[in-house]
Amino acid sequence: NFLQILIITKLANGEVLAPKHKDHPLSGDWVGHRECHIQPDWLLVYRYDNDVLVLALSRTGTHSDLFGL
């Protein structure tokens, strides 16, 4: 998907995502990960390793797919 690749490219380049993507840190079992919205109910969970441009993509899916909500 073009939009997913665009967002991953921005994250890999250290760019800040537009506010519509609601990029934010996660808590609980997901501490150390971040989540952004590719589309309103299509999420990307990711994390950076040691503040370097190593992007570890964790999961993508809807809120229900990822968190059972």
Residue ranges and their predicted role:
Residues 1-40, 49-55, 63-69:
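Basic, Lys/Arg-enriched alpha-helical interface segments
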